[in-house]
Regions:
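An anionic, glycine-rich sequence signature occurring as long contiguous blocks
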Residues: 18, 127, 144-165, 169, ...
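Conserved, well-structured functional cores that handle cations and Mg-NTP chemistry
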Residues: 2-201, 206-223
């Protein structure tokens, strides 16, 4: 029974890879890059500890990494079209009307100055300013699983204002400066256009503080829970302070003690993550006629350690 299950599972994986290969294969005009693309995916899914052109080429039976390197650098194929294919694949197997779109960024440490977008900039991955590239990512979480959906490379202004440097790094002349939230907005729009079903958007303060991104969520019919800073201005909702504009921390500080409730935020690496939580209704900054929530999370061990979130739900749901 166990061996039969193992064989069936391996066959299912093989069938899945064949389906994926057929889905994206037409994006590669020649057989060589098409075969390397499939081998590259197999390598990424393998148990190889180090995954680079050398190790993936060796695994594919190539004597040199040239084929893999050409696939990633000079071969004529459009990664954005492949991304669109893969988003439709995600919809087929993971699509969920209650899905969550998660915006986040990560830093890739670099030593040189030639890699596209590399600069001395803050990296949340390192927790400090480093010479690095910053990628903004859109991921998807649903009951059936979770996966990456999209990506954008953040280009600091010093890059987009230096067209010669951009050309040397392979960045097109039509690429203009965009903030990280603007990159996130473009990815949300693409996911929507590709039919990715979702109910919620989440993101940290970099994205939550940007009102245009919150507007974009609402335009796309998406609810959100987005982190904001202590100095985020909100308009108090129904109650004694109704209509007053206050900082997020000031409005939460005005809540009576009984407002707070201890709830779990789920299990983490060190066990159950429990916090105190409080919420208060606020009027919309973007659409004053709408009603939203300001949510606060407080550490159980340090009551000065708080995080704030602006929340909005579509009419059929609850914030």
């Amino acid at each position: 029974m166990g061996d039969d299950l193992c064989v069936a599972q391996v066959q299912e994986w093989a069938d899945g890879l064949a389906e994926l290969s057929a889905l994206i294969g037409h994006r590669f005009a020649r057989s060589e890059p098409r075969e390397h693309a499939v081998a590259y995916i197999q390598g990424l899914l393998s148990a190889e500890e180090r995954k680079n052109s050398w190790t993936l080429s060796e695994r594919a039976g190539d004597a040199t990494p040239n084929g893999m390197q050409r696939l990633l650098s000079t071969t004529d194929w459009d990664p954005d079209l492949v991304r669109d294919d893969l988003q439709r694949y995600v919809v087929r197997y993971l699509g969920d009307p209650g899905g969550v779109l998660i915006i986040d960024e990560t830093g890739f440490l670099k030593k040189g100055t030639r890699s596209a977008g590399v600069a001395r900039q803050y990296s949340g991955t390192a927790g400090r300013v480093e010479n690095c590239q910053i990628g903004v990512f859109l991921t998807y979480a649903a009951a059936a699983g979770r996966t990456f959906l999209d990506r954008e490379l953040y280009l600091p202004k010093r890059w987009t204002e230096d067209r010669d440097r951009c050309a040397a790094a392979g960045i097109g002349a039509d690429v203009e400066f965009a903030t990280k939230p603007e990159l996130a907005m473009a990815m949300l729009q693409r996911a929507h256009d590709n039919g990715v079903p979702a109910r919620w958007v989440t993101g940290d303060e970099v994205y939550g503080q940007y009102s245009r991104l919150r507007n974009k969520c609402e335009e796309l019919g998406l609810s959100y829970v987005l982190a904001v800073g202590v100095n985020q201005h909100v308009i108090a909702g129904p109650g004694k302070l109704d209509g007053q504009e206050l900082r997020a921390d000031a409005l939460i500080a005005a809540l009576p003690p009984q407002t707070w409730r201890t709830l779990s935020a789920g299990r983490g690496a060190k066990g159950d993550r429990r916090y105190d939580w409080a919420r208060v209704r606020v009027h919309g900054i973007n659409f004053p006629e709408s009603v939203y929530w300001l949510l606060a999370r407080r550490s159980l061990s340090d009551q000065t350690d708080l995080a704030y979130y602006l929340c909005h739900a579509r009419a059929a749901g609850r914030a």
